[in-house]
UniProtKB/Swiss-Prot annotation:
EC assignment: 4.1.1.98
Flavoprotein keyword on record: yes
Organism the protein comes from: Neisseria meningitidis serogroup C / serotype 2a (strain ATCC 700532 / DSM 15464 / FAM18)
Family as reported in the entry's similarity comment: Belongs to the UbiD family.
InterPro entries linked: UbiD (IPR002830), UbiD-like_C (IPR049381), UbiD-like_N (IPR049383), UbiD_bacteria (IPR023677), UbiD_Rift_dom (IPR048304)
Entry protein name: 3-octaprenyl-4-hydroxybenzoate carboxy-lyase
Active-site residues per Swiss-Prot or TrEMBL entry: 292 (proton donor)
GO molecular function: 3-octaprenyl-4-hydroxybenzoate carboxy-lyase activity; metal ion binding
Compartments it resides in: Cell membrane
Highest taxon above the source species: Bacteria
Pfam families: UbiD, UbiD_C, UbiD_N
Main function: Catalyzes the decarboxylation of 3-octaprenyl-4-hydroxy benzoate to 2-octaprenylphenol, an intermediate step in ubiquinone biosynthesis.
C-alpha cells in the first residue's frame, strides 16, 4: 500500500492494530521517552499521544506521534515493502542506479525499461496550494514553545527537535538535500542546527558561506512527512537521484512539493509542520549535552543557529518525535531494516560477500559482521578495506569481523565460534590508525579521528598459515534423516 501523507500511514497502522492512541495526559518532558522506550523494547505499536501537557498541566494544542518506526516491519511498510526481506529488492534497485550495467542483449535492455521509466517519471510535482500552508505564523507569532517538543533525558540541556527533515541547497547544486539533524530549542524562534561537517546540509552551508560570507542562508525544516520521504532521507540514495525522486519511486507516485513562502526551497506539500528561516553569518551557540544513540550524554560544541522566521502547518497538525538512547531505540530499529538495503549495494561492488550485518547493539554502524566466499589468501582484508571505503555510511564503522559463508553473521554464537577457532590475534587482526571516526565517539583519542580494527575470522589458506587446517565436523545426513523419522517415537 502507498501513503500520500503521514495521516494515510497512521490510518493504516491503526486499522491493523499497529498504532495506539493515548488519551491520558502525558508530558513531553521525560514521560513520553519512558513510555516510548518501554513500548519499543516490547516491539509494541506506534503511539499517538493525544493530550500532551505542559509542566503546569495545561494542554498543548497538538498531538505527538512517537515510535512510528519502532519495528523493522513498520519500516518496511513505510517503504512500500510487504516484508523486511523485500527491502533487499529496494537495495538491488539502488545498486543498479548507483552503477548501471550495459544491457546484455535486447531482452535484458527491454527488461530494464520499466524501471528506468518509473524512476525518471518520478520527478517531483510542484503545486501552488498545499495543506502544509493552511496555517501560517509569522513575525512575533512565531513561537516554538507552542509545539510539544520532546525533552528526552534527565540531563538533556533543553527540548530537542528530533525528526525534522532539514532541506538545504548548495550554490552549485540543482537538487536539494534532505538530512535529519537534531535541533536544540534555545528561544521562541531559535534552534541550534547540529549538523556535522561531513553531512550534506553542512556541506551545502559551507559552500554557500564561501561565496556569500555576509548573506543569511535559507533553510527549511519539515516535521511530519509521509513515510517514503522520511525514509528516503536516511537511505543511501545515489547522487544522481534526489531523495524526493526516490520517495516517489517507493510511494509509486510523484512527490508533491510546494515552494516555501519565504524562500525558494521546496517542501513536501502534505507535511504536517514546516519551519522556514535562515542561518545568519557567524551566529553559533553551544549545543548539548544530550543523551544520544550511544547510550551516553555527548560533548558540547558550537553549531550554527537556525532563526525561524515562519511556521506553516496543516489544520490540526501532528508533531512527529522520537528519542535516541542506548540501543535498542528507534534509530537502531531503522538500522536493522536498512541493513537489508545495504546488502545488495555491497554485493554489487563485492560479489563475494554473501551477507552483511550491523548489530544494533553496536549503535547500528560501529561494528559490522561480513560473510564471504573466500577465494585467495588475503581476501578477507580486501573486503574489510572495501567496506570501510565503499559507502560513506560505513566510514565510522570501528570494527569489522569477516567470516566464511558457512557462518551466520546474525548469530553471535556462530560468530564467536569463528573468531575463537579461525583467528590468531596477532596474524589476523588489522589495525588502522588516524581514520575518520564518529564525532560522538568519546573513546577515540582525538575528536573525529581514531582507529579501526578488522578481525579476519575466515579459514586460512596456504600462504596465510603453514599448519594443517582443521576440518569442520559435519553430521551424517543419512543418520540425521533416520533419527528425524523416529524422533516422535523416542518421546524426547
Amino acid at each position: 500500500m502507498k501513503y500520500k501523507d503521514l495521516r494515510d500511514f497512521i490510518a493504516m497502522l491503526e486499522q491493523q492494530g499497529k498504532l495506539k492512541r493515548i488519551a491520558h495526559p502525558v508530558s513531553p518532558h521525560l514521560e513520553m521517552t519512558e513510555i516510548a522506550d518501554r513500548v519499543l523494547r516490547a516491539e509494541g505499536p506506534a503511539l499517538l499521544f493525544e493530550n500532551p501537557v505542559k509542566p503546569d498541566g495545561t494542554r498543548y494544542g497538538y498531538p505527538v506521534l512517537a515510535n512510528l518506526f519502532g519495528t523493522p516491519e513498520r519500516v518496511a511498510m513505510g517503504m512500500g515493502a510487504d516484508s523486511v526481506s523485500k527491502l533487499r529488492e529496494i537495495g538491488q534497485t539502488l545498486a543498479y542506479l548507483k552503477e548501471p550495467e550495459p544491457p546484455k542483449g535486447i531482452k535484458d535492455a527491454f527488461s530494464k525499461l520499466p524501471l528506468l521509466k518509473d524512476i525518471w517519471s518520478m520527478a517531483p510535482n510542484v503545486v501552488k496550494n498545499a495543506p502544509c500552508q493552511e496555517i501560517v505564523w509569522e513575525g512575533e507569532n512565531v513561537d516554538l514553545y507552542k509545539l510539544p517538543i520532546q525533552h528526552c533525558w534527565p540531563e538533556d540541556v533543553a527540548p530537542l527537535v528530533t525528526w525534522g527533515l532539514t532541506v538545504t541547497r548548495g550554490p552549485h547544486k540543482k537538487r536539494q538535500n534532505l538530512g535529519i539533524y537534531r535541533q536544540q530549542l534555545i528561544g521562541k524562534n531559535k534552534l541550534i542546527m547540529r549538523w556535522l561537517s561531513h553531512r550534506g546540509g553542512a556541506l551545502d552551508y559551507q559552500e554557500f558561506r564561501k561565496l556569500n560570507p555576509d548573506t543569511p542562508y535559507p533553510v527549511a525544516v519539515v516535521l511530519g512527512c509521509d513515510p517514503a520521504t522520511i525514509l528516503g532521507a536516511v537511505t543511501p540514495v545515489p547522487d544522481t537521484l534526489s531523495e524526493y525522486q526516490f520517495a516517489g519511486l517507493l510511494r509509486g507516485s510523484r512527490t508533491e512539493l510546494v515552494k516555501c513562502i519565504g524562500n525558494d526551497l521546496q517542501v513536501p506539500a502534505r507535511a504536517e509542520i514546516v519551519l522556514e528561516g535562515v542561518i545568519h553569518p557567524n551566529e553559533t551557540a553551544l549545543e548539548g549535552p544530550y543523551g544520544d544513540h550511544t547510550g551516553y550524554y555527548n560533548e558540547q560544541d558550537h553549531f550554527p543557529v537556525f532563526t525561524v522566521e515562519r511556521i506553516t502547518m496543516r489544520e490540526n497538525p501532528i508533531y512527529h518525535s522520537t528519542y535516541t538512547g542506548k540501543p535498542p531505540d528507534e534509530p537502531a530499529v531503522l538500522g536493522v531494516a536498512l541493513n537489508e538495503v545495504f546488502v545488495p549495494l555491497l554485493q554489487k561492488q563485492f560479489p563475494e560477500i554473501t551477507d552483511f550485518y550491523l548489530p544494533p547493539e553496536g549503535c547500528s554502524y560501529r561494528m559490522a559482521v561480513v560473510s564471504m566466499k573466500k577465494q585467495y589468501a588475503g581476501h578477507a582484508k580486501r573486503v574489510m578495506m572495501g567496506c570501510w571505503s565503499f559507502l560513506r555510511q560505513f566510514m565510522y564503522t570501528k570494527f569489522i569481523i569477516v567470516v566464511d559463508d558457512d557462518v551466520n553473521v546474525r548469530d553471535w554464537k556462530e560468530v564467536i565460534w569463528a573468531v575463537t577457532t579461525r583467528m590468531d590475534p596477532v596474524r589476523d587482526t588489522v589495525l588502522v590508525e588516524n581514520t575518520p571516526i564518529d564525532y560522538l565517539d568519546f573513546a577515540s583519542p582525538v575528536s573525529g579521528l581514531g582507529g579501526k580494527m578488522g578481525l579476519d575470522a575466515t579459514n586460512k589458506w596456504p600462504g596465510e598459515t603453514d599448519r594443517e587446517w582443521g576440518r569442520v565436523i559435519k553430521k551424517d545426513p543419512a543418520v540425521t534423516a533416520k533419527i528425524d523419522g523416529i524422533w516422535e517415537e523416542l518421546g524426547l
